């Protein structure tokens, strides 16, 4: 098989630790019973009976759309205008006052992949937290890109100093930065940056952007599972303070929000 693939990529077998732990959880359930084992690897919403939740409001609405309407092509490769407008309103509401564009993608991972492929050239470096979804690193590897990791935590707080230091080193080497933040509800820790942490983060990015273009990718896959839905998007008001050499890409996914994991419906909101 390797004879048919790219030569200049990492051909190491992909080992997903989540699936291996999930398999161990399933085996433990057989031995100890489901009441004695908590499988915390499931990235999906399940009910108290252990069944996958498919929100009735979502799928009743989806099923009411005529088949021909669902089957036909979108009006443009970047998605239908009504979809793109709906995504922007859902993601940003009235919090962001910046010029923006929305690109439809195959799930939130499609938005992440698009950014990694389009922002960085081969051989350049992606900045990631040391605790993160493993597919970020995989996507970089498939584009022949490197990764540098910042320490996500300083005690029980976001480690801004490590983030800035890592980004500065990358900026000095390649003249631009693409850094990923998975917030709110970071996977796998569940951590959400505070309002003050976001203010300091944007201020630091603005300073770094004086040396070259800075792109921040905010993966919001779990945003609608935040503790307070009324305020969980308030941090986005800080986006209004970005400098002219800063771009923010918000990776939106309907998978978690609308319990539509297999629908592969997402978007990149570019600010």
Where are these regions (language model features)?
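Short, well-ordered beta-to-alpha junction loops that form the rim of enzyme active sites
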Residues: 42-43, 184, 220-221
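Generic enzyme active-site microenvironment
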Residues: 217
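Active-site PLP attachment segment
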Residues: 236-271
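Hydrophobic pocket-lining residues within nucleotide cofactor-binding pockets
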Residues: 45, 152, 254
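Conserved core of the PLP fold type I
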Residues: 66-212, 223-243, 249
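N-terminal small-domain helix-loop-helix segment of the aminotransferase-like
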Residues: 2, 11-107
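Short catalytic/ligand-binding loop motif for oxyanion handling, primarily in non-cytosolic enzymes
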Residues: 46-51, 187-190, 224-226, 258-261
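Catalytic-core helical/loop segments in enzymes performing group transfer/polymerization on anionic/lipid-linked
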Residues: 3-5, 165, 238, 266
């Amino acid at each position: 098989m390797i004879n048919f693939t790219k030569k200049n990529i990492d051909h190491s077998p992909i080992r997903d630790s989540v699936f291996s732990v999930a398999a161990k959880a399933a085996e433990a359930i057989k031995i100890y019973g489901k009441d004695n084992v908590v499988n915390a690897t499931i990235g999906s919403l399940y009910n108290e009976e252990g069944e996958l939740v498919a929100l009735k409001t979502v799928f009743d609405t989806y099923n009411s759309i005529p088949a021909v309407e669902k089957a036909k092509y979108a009006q443009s490769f970047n998605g239908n205008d009504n979809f793109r407008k709906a995504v922007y309103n859902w993601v940003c509401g009235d919090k962001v006052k910046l010029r923006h564009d929305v690109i439809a993608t195959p799930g939130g991972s499609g938005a992440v992949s698009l950014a990694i492929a389009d922002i960085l050239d081969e051989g350049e470096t992606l900045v990631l937290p040391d605790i993160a979804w493993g597919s970020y690193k995989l996507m970089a590897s498939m584009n022949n890109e490197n990764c540098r990791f910042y320490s996500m935590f300083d005690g029980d707080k976001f480690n801004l100093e490590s983030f800035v230091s890592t980004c500065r080193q990358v900026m000095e080497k390649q003249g631009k930065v693409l850094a990923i933040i998975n917030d709110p509800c970071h996977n796998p820790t569940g951590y959400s940056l505070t309002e003050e942490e976001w203010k300091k983060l944007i201020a630091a990015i603005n300073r770094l952007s004086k040396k070259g273009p800075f792109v921040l990718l905010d993966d919001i896959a779990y945003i609608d599972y935040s503790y307070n839905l009324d305020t969980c998007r308030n941090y986005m008001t800080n986006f209004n303070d970005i400098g002219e050499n800063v771009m923010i890409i918000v990776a939106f996914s309907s998978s978690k929000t609308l319990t539509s994991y297999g629908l592969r419906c997402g978007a990149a909101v570019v600010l």
